[in-house]
């Protein structure tokens, strides 16, 4: 299909404060929230919605409903209406000033179909979310931006930008589900938000070592990087899971299977020498690893970083099951070491993302962004926005649910050098055919 330019007319941005007066308070961030790779970053997402077939929703204005809902939910989440401040010791805290979250309404001159499912890299998509000027003093920036862009067909896109110091991905999805509940007319949230950052007392470096987010640094790029994707459909991923579980006699998750396949395929595509070692880093939700576990509704940062390492020759000559077991063991190791405050090997803390032997994976497929329903049904597609170029790097793979017009399964969004893209897809397809044929 011929690519059509996106034309978006943006209204003036406004600050939306809580719908009820709230006392001004100061809230401390946790030691994880204050890590360098967290406190100075934001993360963005686009949620795409089709026009509703319901006659009652035809005349409904999503921008108006979401703006009103935003004011209501900020009563429950006052930090998102506040601003960051720096303490004398250099830590950040949130002053709940009620200044508000930034809200923007926009209208596109196109139908929603112009967007496809965000698999193509198109800089014009950045028009769907206002980009915060990160060169500005963070004290002057809102901690949340919401932009609603309507299309001529009745569909719309909700673009959101969260300051990472206030929440992680799971916390952001929790907030958006609550925002959607308010937009649908609910008078009470189904999940009460919990701030309580004092529950995460990790001043001990033995704890903080498990939450190193510095791997988000972008490497030096010497070759054209292309955004592309690869889908492992639901039937195939289940075939492969069935095959490997018959061998190992234990449960394997879709993420473990897909990440092992990606690890092997990328290592082959990059032709890394057999004598070297390759490493993958991926996030794990540590909420249940704390003692006691963090309560439901806690939306602060609590994602630990698991590390799986293998020799290239062993990885490529071994089975898919072997790679899966290395990943499974790294998850167990992170959990056990965290609980016992064990000191890990310095090599495991080497997260230099400038090296092609180190790869970072992130799993968005189970966070729940696609379950956010403002009254038009669930999002038909969810995608990050590469405004700050943190994720647009050859060492980063993002696992998502495919768009609704694609087969169910796992969509692997990646940024590869043009010369490696074809080889990677060939290797993935070869593994899929090999394991599906066994069943």
From Swiss-Prot:
Domain of life: Eukaryota
Broad EC category: transferase
Gene3D superfamilies (alphabetical): Chloramphenicol acetyltransferase-like domain
Keyword annotations: Acyltransferase, Taxol biosynthesis, Transferase
Residues annotated as the enzyme's active site: 164, 373
GO BP: paclitaxel biosynthetic process
Pfam families: Transferase
Reactions catalysed according to its record: taxa-4(20),11-dien-5alpha-ol + acetyl-CoA = taxa-4(20),11-dien-5alpha-yl acetate + CoA
MF GO annotations: taxadien-5-alpha-ol O-acetyltransferase activity
EC number: 2.3.1.162
Pathway: Alkaloid biosynthesis; taxol biosynthesis; 10-deacetyl-2-debenzoylbaccatin III from taxa-4(20),11-dien-5alpha-ol: step 1/3
Family: Belongs to the plant acyltransferase family.
Protein name per its UniProtKB record: Taxadien-5-alpha-ol O-acetyltransferase
Native organism taxonomy: Eukaryota, Viridiplantae, Streptophyta, Embryophyta, Tracheophyta
